[in-house]
Amino acid sequence: MVAHRARRRKRASATELYKTCKVAGTCPPDVIPKVEGTTLADRILQWGSLGVYLGGLGIGTGSGTGGRTGYVPVGTRPGTVVDVSIPTRPPVVIEPVGPSDPSIVTLLEESSVINSGATIPTFTGTSGFEITSSATTTPAVLDITPAGDNVVITSTNFNNPLFTEPSLLEIPQTGETSGRVLVGTPTSGVHGYEEIPMDTFATSGTGLEPISSTPVPGVSRVAGPRLYGKALTQVRVSDPAFLTQPSSFVTFDNPVYDPEDETIIFERPSPGTRVPDPDFMDIVKLHRPALTSRRGTVRFSRVGQKFSMRTRSGTNIGARVHYYHDLSPILPTEDIELEPLLPPADPTAEESLYDIYADVDEADMAFTGGGRGATTYGGRITPSVFSSTLSTRYGNVTIPFVSPVDVPLHTGPDIILPSSAQWPFVPVAPADTTHYVYIDGGDYFLWPVTFPVSRKRRRKRLSYFLADGFVAL
């Protein structure tokens, strides 16, 4: 077994260690010289700088910026720094003030010459100016009328018909196209207008359809729900109770109201809670159902939301599941083979058709097929074998009939009976003694009633139709 060495933790920088260990005196031996610049390399540079001037080259333990003047290419002269002197302000002369000097500082400088200004003349005696006074009694009249023609001032009012009082307008009758002059108050003015009928440009429809400003051409299809994406888990539910009681798969409660076509919201399941169906574990929401057609079936679908975890921000995270139940398959259309309707062999019945409501004489019927039934003769019901093929003088019509008894059928020629108003005589009870009957003639048939069939015994194979022969009973 290989032992893994513990990972070495990085030590703090020398500057950070120096701040804490210098006071306590627990610094490693390489921290203080590195921070204070007393390493062997620093001392060699300090000793060598005493005899060699290396200031311009920037060799030292500084930041490596080339000193004060910076790096200069070899063979060139370093730049000269010109000091621009700033002019200094002249000093203010401070005059000392003695203790006997006044503390009030005069704003004006003292002067020994005083200018008194011009002298005022004085008048003496009676000589001098003469003062006269005059008075006028005529008032001054000013003519303010300007020269030229007189000016006449007029005013004009412009009325807006949009703000005319509605009660003063006389509305014309419907369909009137002649001009009308409306006279109202002096402020309303006189207006004339004409009513123009509007034409309808609709070429189709009844006029009751909703009007749309931007009609969509063609037929717009509503997008169906996306239930078969990678984000949904497909789960098939075979229980038909999923159609009417979907909440019974999530909880054991039996609610009074269980919505069938709405979204169902459940409480958050507590850990360890059992559910009726394991496929519905951790379900907190079942969306409303949708009926879709998928691969030849009618499908009932619901989308469920699971509660798996909750983030610190309060967001619930869980998978989405598509639960579906197939209602019925949509089978393809079955092709039924139709038999052609051939014309009858008898040319006289070429245009005849079989009418199920027509009154067909029972004496004109001939039974050629097999089947079970009952025939009434004088109030007595006698079991007989009905046919599946009717032969009449109007043509042959085949009526399918399924018999529960295995009756042997043998093909033979169609027998057309002569038209007669009476049925062949059938004795009610057989004679006591057995008589032999010899029949010698042409074609004939035996009435099926004479051969009763027992349900318990197996029927013997017997030909019902004979032709050109002797029969002995």
Curated annotation (Swiss-Prot):
One of its GO terms (cellular component) is host cell nucleus. One of its GO terms (molecular function) is structural molecule activity. Highly phosphorylated. It is found in: Virion; Host nucleus; Host early endosome; Host Golgi apparatus. GO terms for biological process: microtubule-dependent intracellular transport of viral material towards nucleus; symbiont entry into host cell; viral penetration into host nucleus. Keywords: Capsid protein, Cytoplasmic inwards viral transport, Disulfide bond, DNA-binding, Host endosome, Host Golgi apparatus, Host nucleus, Host-virus interaction, Late protein, Microtubular inwards viral transport, Phosphoprotein, Viral penetration into host nucleus, Virion, Virus entry into host cell. A motif (Nuclear localization signal) lies at residues 1-12, 452-462. It comes from the Viruses. Belongs to the papillomaviridae L2 protein family. Minor protein of the capsid that localizes along the inner surface of the virion, within the central cavities beneath the L1 pentamers. Plays a role in capsid stabilization through interaction with the major capsid protein L1. Once the virion enters the host cell, L2 escorts the genomic DNA into the nucleus by promoting escape from the endosomal compartments and traffic through the host Golgi network. This is Minor capsid protein L2. The lineage of its organism: Viruses, Monodnaviria, Shotokuvirae, Cossaviricota, Papovaviricetes.
